[in-house]
A protein has these predicted regions:
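C-terminal capping/extension of enzyme domains
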Residues: 146-192
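Non-Sec secretion/translocation targeting segments of pathogen effectors
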Residues: 1-3, 191-192
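A structural signal for short, hydrophobic/glycine-enriched beta-strand patches
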Residues: 2-160
């Protein structure tokens, strides 16, 4: 990203993948916490930012859960036109891959707020380390579920080895290029 770009707009990602509704079709408490954090961010933007009209909430959830979460956001005062429910994300890494491909096309990228359980901060950090220069902020919500449930969610979020392999190949190629630049004579001697 070039240095002369400025932030234009806001994208709030409310991450609610892999949730199970309670028996009475109610949202679990940890999702209600995420909705509360999302609503606070939305209200803060609406009260203070000049680019508030260019704000969208990208809700990552399944169809059934997404409609219930959307209704809760509407009850909290969020405009319906600002909410987009997307159920095609496999995990946090996939979400950012798709989102950043769209954002890179914009001349001035938006500020991105990622709302999830605070236990997913390390996954968020790993996923977003490749997007330096963009304003991406983690907003953690409390998650009081048992550790087993949280760890089960984390297993679903594991970054694929494919991403790691691509990074390793890129690093190896850079090292090779650097060594070839530093020691160009070694290659010439070997080929003779």
């Amino acid at each position: 990203m070039s240095e002369n770009r400025f932030v234009s707009g806001n994208v709030i990602i409310l991450y609610c993948n892999f949730i199970k509704l309670e028996s009475n079709k109610q949202l679990p408490q940890h999702i209600m916490e995420r909705i509360a954090v999302c609503t606070k961010i939305y209200e803060r933007i609406m009260k203070s930012k000049p680019d508030k009209s260019d704000t969208i909430i990208n809700l990552a959830a399944g169809n059934d859960e997404g409609s219930i979460i959307k209704n809760q956001l509407l009850k909290n005062g969020v405009e319906e036109s600002k909410i987009v429910v997307v159920n095609s994300y496999n995990n946090i890494g996939h979400l950012f891959s798709v989102l950043m491909n769209e954002i890179k096309k914009r001349p001035n990228p938006p500020a991105i707020y990622f709302v999830s359980s605070y236990q997913q901060k390390d996954i968020f950090d790993k996923v977003t380390e490749g997007y330096k220069g963009y304003r991406i902020q983690f907003e953690g919500a409390f998650d009081k579920r048992p550790n087993e449930s949280i760890e089960e969610d984390a297993k679903k979020e594991k970054l694929s080895k494919r991403i790691t392999n691509i990074k390793e190949k890129g690093k190896n190629k850079m090292v090779d290029m650097l060594l070839n630049y530093i020691f160009p004579e070694n290659k010439r001697r070997q080929s003779s």
